[in-house]
Amino acid sequence: MNREDNTSVYSNQSSIHDDLFKLVRKHMTSTWQEPTPPHDCEAMRDIVALLKAHNGPLILDSFCGTGMSTAKLASQHPKALVIGIDKSADRLRRHVQTPSHNYHLIRGNCEHIWAQLVAANIDCEQHYLLYPNPWPKKAHLKRRIHGHPSFPLLMQLGGAIEVRSNWKIYVDEFAAAAQLLGLDTQVKSLSATDPLTLFERKYAANNENLWVCRAATA
């Protein structure tokens, strides 16, 4: 197993996965058709109701965990409706409420909610994917966001995408996959002076290298 300098991620993968481009091209030529669970349909109805009651743009915070980042993004974008999505009720229950009133936490599977938003022609202005599970084993490429068949939905949702990780290979892969979708991408090192998430705070405190990929339509 290889350990990249200044990261707690251990992996048997030392560069962009050999199968990445083939896998992304396969997903670009097909439509993800996994049935949507009833609770994700209910989550979508909640989001639609929130959008109807709000006049500002939509910002998504997918895989939001405890929602710390959702609240921080809401304070940074007071005119936007910021929706944090996570499948874990336990993580969402640990959210510490803030004075901002323009954000909501939704329990649901992000991929199914993305698909429903696209089907409803609902666009987002910005989309944050902050420290998702990196699935660092080489055999787990298909479990990463950019290796999942729902990945093309991110482009269809529109807006600027921001992915953060403490594993550079992850953001390099995401950038390469996003370029296949026709997005402009930029990968940079990140200085977390005001951490958005609990993970970011932990990694910064441990002096780990942090990376960000920003992607948007050309």
Model feature map: region roles:
Residues 1-58, 68-76, 96-121:
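S-adenosyl-L-methionine
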Residues 88:
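Conserved SAM/SAH-binding beta-strand->alpha-helix loop
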